[in-house]
Design a protein with these regions (language model features):
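Metabolite-binding pocket within alpha/beta catalytic cores that recognizes anionic/polar moieties
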Residues: 1-141, 145-149
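Short acidic/polar active-site loop segments enriched in Thr and Asp
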Residues: 98-99, 190, 209
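Active-site rim beta-loop-alpha module in soluble metabolic enzymes
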Residues: 138-186
């Protein structure tokens, strides 16, 4: 199969550092959010200043600098789906990013996970294509190998319950059939999203630290689909508070570097 043809050669015909150059004083940590409405809310709340841009056929995508608790961070809106998400962060890394903290929603495969509940993935099922260009073929990839303890302490400090487990990364959300969901649950999956496996593989390949956490949205562990808070306007205040947890983790990482 083509997906088994992993090539470890890092020098491609087109390399990200051909397109993007280092940005002076670029923050070490990039915090990224998928929801456009939520992203703009947080940028405005933290008084973000544009420091760079990426460009593609869909338009111009600003990179912002924000300050949270006296620490500087970059903010960038994540793109939906593994190829777009990975490609955009390939553009960001040459600017100077050393780690990425990614926040997004997910569908749950376990109905006991509450709406907007926090999920920390520990491994991802690689049911997409992008990760196979960055890592040898396998069904799973371990994710969040660093900073889990730090994030758990953030959640406990702020009184957020959470679950940990396997996520299913897929390319085709309209092909989440009942039989496929059952098989992924047998593999241990408790939720489904579209980017985690590929982002971890790319960051491993590029030597970049990566941490992703999810908040539960629609419920697929049911005879029919239950969208719950999947809408970008639903429970927005709760999601804003969840988004700030990413910055709490980023601060904890920065403070740990100073110890």
């Amino acid at each position: 199969m083509l997906l088994t043809e992993f090539d470890c050669e890092k020098n491609a015909v087109i390399n990200p550092d051909i397109i993007h150059k280092p940005v002076e004083n670029f923050p070490d940590t990039v915090v990224s959010i998928f929801s456009n409405r939520l992203f703009q809310k947080i940028v405005d709340f933290l008084g973000g200043t544009e420091i760079a841009q990426t460009h593609d056929v869909d338009g111009i995508w600003p990179v912002y600098e924000v300050t949270y608790q006296n620490h500087r961070f970059a903010m960038y809106k994540a793109r939906l789906g593994a190829p777009a998400c990975v490609g955009c962060f390939e553009d960001i890394i040459p600017m100077g990013a050393k780690r990425i903290i990614l926040l997004g929603n997910c569908g749950v495969l376990d109905r006991s996970i509450e709406d907007c509940g926090i999920i920390i993935p520990t491994r991802a099922i690689r049911d997409e294509g992008t990760s196979y260009h960055y890592a040898p073929a396998s069904d799973f990839i371990d994710v969040n190998r660093k900073y889990v303890d730090e994030f758990r302490s953030v959640l406990e400090k702020h009184g957020y319950p959470y679950v940990m487990g396997t996520t299913w990364t897929t390319d085709a959300f309209y092909r989440e059939t009942h039989s496929k969901i059952a098989r992924r649950k047998e593999m241990g999956a408790i939720c489904v999203e579209m980017e985690c496996a590929a982002m971890q593989a790319m960051c491993d390949f590029r030597g970049i630290e990566f941490f992703q956490f999810l908040y539960a949205a629609d419920n697929l562990d049911h005879s029919s689909w239950d969208p719950r808070s999947l809408s970008g306007t639903s429970r927005l205040e709760d999601k804003e508070k969840i988004a700030l947890l990413a910055f709490e983790l980023a601060c904890k990482i920065e403070e740990g570097k100073l110890c």
